[in-house]
Amino acid sequence: MKFEWDEEKRLANVVKHGVDFTDACRLFEGPFMIMTDNRRDYGEIRSIAFGHVENRLIAVAFTKRQDIIRIISARKANDREKKRFEDAIADRLETNRFHEG
């Protein structure tokens, strides 16, 4: 997979959330879950991926442009997101939303 991002946004994200986009790319190497982010009209399809990086569940907002994943933000998953992720794994009801890197 190829990744891209805005460098100023990456630096601001490290300060705000403590997660570097260079580390967030590794989420896509292991099991992860993707949900569509439809909270607003972004003018493009945005998704949020949830997965573990260094034993920490993170959320990565991104958009896919052809074969490139453009990272928009990355942060530690909140408690509600952690529960949703854990429930999906435990129940295996949503296996079509899990992807192996």
Region locations from a protein language model:
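Ribonuclease/tRNase effector modules and their secretory precursors
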Residues: M1-G101
